[in-house]
């Protein structure tokens, strides 16, 4: 089986550069598994985990939106934000989740921006999920 050159980049810089045998990402249309030789595509990403099948096992990256471009043996992910599992501070992520849940509760009571509170909660849960996958 061949391999893919994978790049995950945010506005703050590169998060992951490496080789993978498979990339699994959740797009707006559903989950996609990308193998070498995949048809070229561009797809918007949801807030979720990007799983990279590598020789040593699997690496998880918490991605908070963006786009994935597949072209030949190249997979480029341009993410709003992204963190590798080993870079996630679980205490900070848990606190962010708690703040987002409180904000969501207030949003429902006070009719303030519920959408922003839901997005903050999704991002926090996504980071926790990435960190705890092992």
From Swiss-Prot:
Annotated Gene Ontology cellular component terms: plasma membrane; proton-transporting ATP synthase complex
Predominant cellular place of this UniProt entry's protein: membrane
**Membrane topology recorded in Swiss-Prot or TrEMBL:** Peripheral membrane protein
Determine if Membrane is one of this entry's keywords: yes
- Protein location: Cell membrane
Among Pfam families, the record links this protein to: ATP-synt_DE (PF00401), ATP-synt_DE_N (PF02823)
Please, which domain of life does this record's source organism belong to?
Bacteria
Checking InterPro entries in the record gives:
ATP_F1_dsu/esu_C_sf (IPR036794), ATP_synth_F1_dsu/esu (IPR001469), ATP_synth_F1_dsu/esu_N (IPR020546), ATP_synth_F1_esu_C (IPR020547), ATPsynth_dsu/esu_N (IPR036771)
Q: Which GO terms describe its molecular function?
A: ATP binding; proton-transporting ATP synthase activity, rotational mechanism
Q: Give the record's keywords alphabetically.
A: ATP synthesis, Cell membrane, CF(1), Hydrogen ion transport, Ion transport, Membrane, Transport
Quaternary data: F-type ATPases have 2 components, CF(1) - the catalytic core - and CF(0) - the membrane proton channel. CF(1) has five subunits: alpha(3), beta(3), gamma(1), delta(1), epsilon(1). CF(0) has three main subunits: a, b and c.
Family the entry assigns: Belongs to the ATPase epsilon chain family.
**UniProt xrefs under NCBIfam families:** ATP_synt_epsi, PRK00571.1-3, PRK13442.1
What this chain does, per the entry, is described as: Produces ATP from ADP in the presence of a proton gradient across the membrane.
Name of protein:
ATP synthase epsilon chain
Give me the gene this protein comes from: atpC
């Amino acid at each position: 089986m061949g391999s893919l050159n994978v790049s995950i980049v945010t506005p703050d810089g590169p998060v992951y550069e490496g080789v993978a045998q498979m990339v699994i990402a959740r797009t707006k249309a559903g989950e996609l598994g990308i193998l070498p030789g995949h048809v070229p595509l561009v797809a918007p990403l949801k807030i979720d985990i990007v799983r990279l099948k590598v020789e040593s096992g699997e690496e998880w990256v918490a991605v908070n939106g963006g786009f994935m471009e597949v072209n030949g043996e190249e997979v480029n992910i341009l993410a709003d934000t992204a963190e590798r599992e080993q870079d996630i501070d679980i205490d900070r992520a848990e606190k962010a989740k708690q703040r987002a849940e409180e904000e969501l509760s207030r949003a429902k009571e006070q009719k303030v921006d519920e959408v922003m509170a839901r997005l903050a909660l999704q991002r926090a849960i996504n980071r926790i999920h990435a960190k705890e996958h092992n």
